[in-house]
Curated annotation (Swiss-Prot):
Keywords: Acyltransferase, Amino-acid biosynthesis, Diaminopimelate biosynthesis, Lysine biosynthesis, Repeat, Transferase. Catalyzes the transfer of an acetyl group from acetyl-CoA to tetrahydrodipicolinate. CDD domains: LbH_THP_succinylT. This is 2,3,4,5-tetrahydropyridine-2,6-dicarboxylate N-acetyltransferase. The gene is dapH. PROSITE patterns: HEXAPEP_TRANSFERASES. Belongs to the transferase hexapeptide repeat family. DapH subfamily.
Amino acid sequence: MTNLDAKSIIEYIGNAPKKTPVKVFIKGNLDQLNFPNTIENFTEQHSGIIFGDWKDVEPFLNDNKEKIVQYRIENDVRNSAVPLIDLKKFNARIEPGAIIRDQVAIGKNAVIMMGAIINIGAEIGDDTMIDMGVVLGGRAIVGKHCHIGAGSVLAGVIEPASAKPVQIDDDVVIGANAVVIEGIHVGKGAVIAAGAIVTKDVEPYTMVAGVPAKVIKKVDNKTLDKTGLEDDLRKI
């Protein structure tokens, strides 16, 4: 796991070089160009693609106007301090459209569905599913074999540095569109109903529902029948 505390994350972001990466499609007399080491180029005689930071690419384009006939720039961030993580290193199922920042830990056989947003310092345990559109804020911790329902939010805490992160223990099921505010601890095997707003810690094997969430009952066999997880969905 990342084990990043708030102070470490603040230092990481504060000291990180801020980057504006761009991809540029160019046409012209490209064989006459001298590309600096700061610009990666995949060009042929008259067309190609270059990659680099805008602070390097912009002056290069301006200095070579006579040789470059046409160009189109693609760019999706500005002065970004935290890049997206390299997904290839995880033994997990990560679907298209998930946005996962650097310094995130994802356990074996975890599932990250489309549109999930996972911020720096978050931790996801083995066999846990993060459903569509879920937001895991900075430093949010989710244990093993959990299901975080579509559209749910686990609030992040990076500032103030003294704040406690959300902690979800193993075997927890959270229904769609629930919100767990910062600093909340949800105990092992608990169930949070869809749409609940959790403002207090939840005891293990307890079901809560409502706004704000209140204890409904202890998790029983009937609850488990309705909230059981399917291990086949977690196979890689």
